[in-house]
C-alpha cells in the first residue's frame, strides 16, 4: 500500500469514527432537570413527573438544597421506581419570616446559588429544566435563563409562591395545579402517585362499605400539634351511639402524646407515626380530617374523598385556606379555621358526619369530580412538546 493510499484509508477511518461518535451523541437520552425541595408538597409531584419523563426515555437529574429533606426522599423514590436520579445541590434556603439580617444577606446568597446552579446545569447539559416551586427553584430557574435552557414551572398551591411569580415572567411554559393561581397558567392539576390514581371510584367503594364510619386523621408526617391534640378530645365528646373507627397519622415525634390524648378521651384509635401506603388508607376511609396542603387536597380529589380541613394558620399568604376552597366550594369538604376551633365545636361537626354515609358519599363524589386525572402524563406531554419544538 502506498503512503497516499494509507493516508486516504486513515482519513476515511477517522471520518467513520467521527460519524459514529456524533451518532452516539445524538442518540444519547436527553436529560431533564427537576428542581424541587423544602417540603413534600414540592418534591412528590416532582417525583411523579420524573417517573413519567423517564418512561419516555429521558434521563432524570434533580436539583435540591444542601441539607434539605429532598435528598433522602429522592434517593428512596429512585430505588422504588427502579431508575437513577442524579442528585445535585446548591446552598439556598427561604428568607420570608426569618428577620432583617436574612433579608439583607439574601441577594448575596441568591447570586452565589445562581452561580452554583449554572455550573451544575453546564455539566448536565439538560434539554429542559422543570421548576416545581420552593426556594431552590429560583436560582436554578435564573441559571437556566442565563444558559438559554427551556424552563417549565409548575405551581402546586392555589396562591402562587414568590419563586414562581418571578420565574413566570420568563418561563417558556407555566403549569398550575389550581385554576387562576398564576397568570396564563395552564391548568393540569397536581401530579400524584400512580397508586393513588388507581383507587376505585367513590361510588364503587361506598357500595361495599358497611359498619362503623371510618375516619382518617392526618396530623402530617411532621406532626400537626393542633390536630393531634384537638381531634382526640373532640372524638371524646361525640354521641356515644355513633360507631366509628379511627386511623390517625401523627408524625414520628407526636406518636406517644397523641396515644395519650386518645386514652384520656376514652377513645379507641389506631395511632401510627407514618402511613407508608397512603392509597390504601384513603381507600379505607369514609372521610379525612387534615391540613390542606396542595398535595393533600389533590390526592383527596384524585381518590374522591370528603374532608374536614383545618388549614395551617401560619402558611405564607394563607395558601392552605385557598387550597381548601377548591373542594369546599363544590361541597366536597368543610373548612374550620384553627383559631375558631375547639373540641366542642369540632364534635358538633363530627356528630353530623358520623350520622350516616349518604352525605359522605356525596362529598366523595364531588371531590372526584374536581380531580385532574393523569396530571403527570399531561405534564410530560407539554414538556416533550417543548423539547421537540
Curated annotation (Swiss-Prot):
Q: How does it sit in the membrane?
A: Peripheral membrane protein
The GO annotation for biological process reads: carbohydrate metabolic process; cell division; cell wall organization; lipid glycosylation; peptidoglycan biosynthetic process; regulation of cell shape
Query: Which reactions are catalysed by this chain?
Result: di-trans,octa-cis-undecaprenyl diphospho-N-acetyl-alpha-D-muramoyl-L-alanyl-D-glutamyl-meso-2,6-diaminopimeloyl-D-alanyl-D-alanine + UDP-N-acetyl-alpha-D-glucosamine = di-trans,octa-cis-undecaprenyl diphospho-[N-acetyl-alpha-D-glucosaminyl-(1->4)]-N-acetyl-alpha-D-muramoyl-L-alanyl-D-glutamyl-meso-2,6-diaminopimeloyl-D-alanyl-D-alanine + UDP + H(+)
Instruction: Provide a Gene Ontology MF annotation, just one.
Output: undecaprenyldiphospho-muramoylpentapeptide beta-N-acetylglucosaminyltransferase activity
Localization (cell): Cell inner membrane
Q: What metabolic or biological pathway is this protein involved in?
A: Cell wall biogenesis; peptidoglycan biosynthesis
Enzyme Commission code: 2.4.1.227
Q: What keyword terms does UniProt attach to this protein?
A: Cell cycle, Cell division, Cell inner membrane, Cell membrane, Cell shape, Cell wall biogenesis/degradation, Glycosyltransferase, Membrane, Peptidoglycan synthesis, Transferase
Q: Where does UDP-N-acetyl-alpha-D-glucosamine bind?
A: 39-41, 157, 193, 221, 275, 294-299, 320
Superkingdom to which the source organism belongs: Bacteria
Q: Name one Pfam family in it.
A: Glyco_transf_28
> What are the annotated GO cellular component locations?
plasma membrane
Main subcellular location of this protein, as a coarse class: membrane
Q: Which HAMAP family match?
A: MurG
Q: Which family does it belong to?
A: Belongs to the glycosyltransferase 28 family. MurG subfamily.
According to its UniProt entry, what is the function of this protein? Cell wall formation. Catalyzes the transfer of a GlcNAc subunit on undecaprenyl-pyrophosphoryl-MurNAc-pentapeptide (lipid intermediate I) to form undecaprenyl-pyrophosphoryl-MurNAc-(pentapeptide)GlcNAc (lipid intermediate II).
Q: Which PANTHER family match?
A: GLYCOSYLTRANSFERASE, UDP-N-ACETYLGLUCOSAMINE--N-ACETYLMURAMYL-(PENTAPEPTIDE) PYROPHOSPHORYL-UNDECAPRENOL N-ACETYLGLUCOSAMINE TRANSFERASE 1
The identity of this protein, by name, is UDP-N-acetylglucosamine--N-acetylmuramyl-(pentapeptide) pyrophosphoryl-undecaprenol N-acetylglucosamine transferase
Q: Which organism is it from?
A: Saccharophagus degradans (strain 2-40 / ATCC 43961 / DSM 17024)
Amino acid at each position: 500500500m502506498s503512503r497516499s493510499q494509507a493516508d486516504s484509508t486513515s482519513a476515511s477511518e477517522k471520518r467513520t469514527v467521527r460519524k459514529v461518535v456524533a451518532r452516539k451523541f445524538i442518540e444519547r437520552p436527553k436529560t431533564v432537570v427537576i428542581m424541587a425541595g423544602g417540603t413534600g408538597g414540592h418534591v412528590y409531584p416532582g417525583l411523579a413527573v420524573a417517573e413519567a419523563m423517564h418512561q419516555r426515555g429521558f434521563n432524570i437529574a434533580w436539583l435540591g438544597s444542601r441539607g434539605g429533606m429532598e435528598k433522602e426522599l429522592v434517593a428512596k423514590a429512585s430505588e422504588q421506581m427502579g431508575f437513577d436520579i442524579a442528585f445535585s445541590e446548591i446552598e439556598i434556603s427561604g428568607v420570608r419570616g426569618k428577620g432583617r439580617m436574612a433579608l439583607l444577606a439574601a441577594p448575596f446568597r441568591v447570586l452565589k446559588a445562581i452561580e452554583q446552579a449554572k455550573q451544575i446545569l453546564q455539566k448536565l447539559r439538560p434539554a429542559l429544566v422543570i421548576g416545581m416551586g420552593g426556594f431552590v427553584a429560583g436560582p436554578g430557574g435564573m441559571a437556566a435563563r442565563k444558559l438559554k435552557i427551556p424552563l417549565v414551572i409548575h405551581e402546586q398551591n392555589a396562591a402562587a409562591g414568590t419563586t414562581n411569580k418571578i420565574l413566570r415572567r420568563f418561563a417558556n411554559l407555566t403549569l398550575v395545579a389550581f385554576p387562576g393561581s398564576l397568570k396564563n397558567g395552564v391548568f393540569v392539576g397536581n401530579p400524584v402517585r400512580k397508586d393513588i390514581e388507581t383507587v376505585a371510584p367513590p361510588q364503587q367503594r361506598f357500595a361495599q362499605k358497611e359498619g362503623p364510619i371510618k375516619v382518617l386523621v392526618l396530623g402530617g408526617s411532621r406532626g400537626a400539634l393542633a390536630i393531634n391534640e384537638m381531634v382526640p378530645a373532640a372524638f371524646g365528646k361525640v354521641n356515644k351511639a355513633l360507631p366509628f373507627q379511627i386511623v390517625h397519622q401523627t408524625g414520628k415525634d407526636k406518636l406517644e402524646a397523641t396515644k395519650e390524648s386518645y386514652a384520656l378521651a376514652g377513645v379507641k384509635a389506631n395511632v401510627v407515626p407514618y402511613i407508608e401506603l397512603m392509597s390504601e388508607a384513603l381507600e379505607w376511609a369514609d372521610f379525612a380530617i387534615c391540613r390542606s396542603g396542595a398535595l393533600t387536597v389533590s390526592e383527596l380529589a384524585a381518590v374522591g374523598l370528603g374532608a374536614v380541613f383545618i388549614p395551617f394558620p401560619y402558611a405564607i399568604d394563607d395558601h392552605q385556606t385557598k387550597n381548601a376552597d377548591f373542594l369546599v366550594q363544590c361541597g366536597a369538604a368543610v373548612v374550620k379555621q384553627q383559631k375558631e376551633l375547639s373540641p366542642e365545636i369540632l364534635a358538633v361537626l363530627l356528630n353530623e358526619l358520623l350520622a350516616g354515609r349518604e352525605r359522605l358519599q356525596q362529598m366523595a363524589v364531588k371531590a372526584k369530580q374536581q380531580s385532574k386525572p393523569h396530571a403527570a402524563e399531561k405534564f410530560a406531554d407539554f414538556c416533550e412538546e417543548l423539547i421537540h419544538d
